[in-house]
Regions:
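Alpha-helix C-terminal capping segments
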Residues: 61-65, 83-84, 181-190
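N-terminal short beta-loop-beta anion/metal-coordinating cradle
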Residues: 1-60, 65-66
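Active-site-proximal beta-strand elements of phosphoester/diester hydrolases
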Residues: 43-48, 146-148, 194
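His/Asp/Glu-rich mid-to-C-terminal helical/loop segments that flank catalytic regions of hydrolases
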Residues: 201-240
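Proline-aspartate-enriched helix->loop->beta-strand connector
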Residues: 67-72
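Mid-sequence, gly/pro-rich, charge-dense loop/helix-turn segments that line enzyme active sites
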Residues: 80-167
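A C-terminal functional module that forms or caps the active site or interfaces directly
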Residues: 152-202, 206
């Protein structure tokens, strides 16, 4: 099975590259890709850059060149749900844009001609949630819910509340997952967003949790992605909901 993992930043890239074996670097169309192994799976890892355009370009290049069975948007995200804590994990049941408006004829966040929300395969959500019950993941908390994406680093309670006014059920917020989900929808490639929570803006002050995450906590926190991938077995079982 071939799995593509897309992250935005170099810190996330370094964390995830460390869980791979037999790595090699390849360069195509201004993008670097690292290929490697994780157990019996072939992994293609890419640092796409921050934001929707960078991530969409990265997803297109990955799908066109490597044809993965599954694409995962990984790295970190802000927690929209105040019950979350730093290093918890959110697997997105669906993704939406929090900064798109195409008029009252469609839902807020919906691009005309596209679904209002991009849903992940139910089987992958169940696999991710099953991590909560594994003996060697006893300190782990995985939660499923809506992830919203937009061109904004959410570093204030005020901005987070503005997003929640439109998406009160949002669980996490990032800058890439929905654009990758849209590309995968168009290219008919299974997709899931699986993100480690770096901060919870509604419980934070001036992104102090976020910076503390990278300074003190991040090392090893992406091992959970390895655990998740190990649970994914048969690509034929992955269907879009």
């Amino acid at each position: 099975m071939k799995i593509g993992i897309i992250v935005a930043m170099d810190k996330e890239f370094a964390q995830l590259k460390a869980i791979l074996s037999n790595t090699e670097t390849e360069h195509f169309n201004h993008k670097d890709f690292v290929t490697g192994r994780l157990g019996d799976k072939e992994i293609i890892l890419q640092q796409c850059g921050i934001g929707k355009v960078n991530s969409a370009i990265g997803a297109v290049e990955m799908i066109n060149h490597y044809h993965p069975d599954l694409v995962i948007s990984s790295g970190c995200a802000g927690g929209a749900d105040t019950s979350l804590e730093v290093t918890d994990v959110v697997v997105a049941t669906e993704c939406a844009y929090h900064d798109a408006y195409c008029g009252d004829e469609v839902a807020y966040g919906q691009i005309i001609g596209m679904p209002a929300r991009f849903k992940a395969p139910t089987e992958l959500i169940e696999k991710a949630l099953s991590l909560n019950n594994l003996p060697d993941c006893k300190d782990l908390h995985v939660k499923a819910g809506l992830t919203v994406s937009g061109e904004w680093f959410v570093n204030s309670r005020e901005k987070m509340q503005q997003i929640m006014d439109h998406f009160p059920e949002a669980t996490a917020v990032d800058m890439e997952s929905c654009s990758i989900a849209q590309v995968c929808h168009i290219y008919q490639t299974p997709f899931v967003s699986f993100r480690v929570i770096s901060d919870v803006p509604l419980k934070d002050n001036k992104a102090s949790q976020y910076y503390n995450f990278w300074e003190r906590i991040a090392n090893g926190s992406f091992e959970v992605t390895k655990q998740f991938i190990n649970l994914i077995q048969n690509p034929s079982l992955i269907h879009n909901s």
